[in-house]
Amino acid sequence: MITSSAQRIADYRQRGWWGDLTLHGMLRHHAANNPHLLAVADQPNRHALTGDAPLRLSFTELDHASDNLASQLLHAGITSGDAILVQLPNIAELVM
């Protein structure tokens, strides 16, 4: 899904703000170069929001979780270009 005009995309690329890496490509890059660094962390009150303990995920753990979610979506028949809705509180899973 593309949400920006062709003119804006060209402008941002020309300025160097946007490149060719996808969001998952950037995650994969950080997982390869900084595998054990903290990528995402829940806020301390996660238990109040979900009943679960706060999560802290390294870039490698986030990359694996992202791959797992992608596999589950493909298994459910969701493919590239399909629009989906995500509704979650402000928790680590929101970035997967």
What are these language model-derived features?
Residues 1-25, 43-45:
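Flexible, non-catalytic linker and terminal segments flanking ANL/adenylate-forming cores
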Residues 17-19, 36-95:
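Conserved AMP-binding/adenylate-forming core of the ANL superfamily
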Residues 26-27, 69:
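Generic structural signal for hydrophobic residues
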Residues 28-29, 64:
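A broad detector of short, well-ordered amphipathic alpha-helices
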Residues 29-36:
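Flexible acidic/glycine-rich loop/turn elements at helix↔coil and beta-strand↔loop transitions
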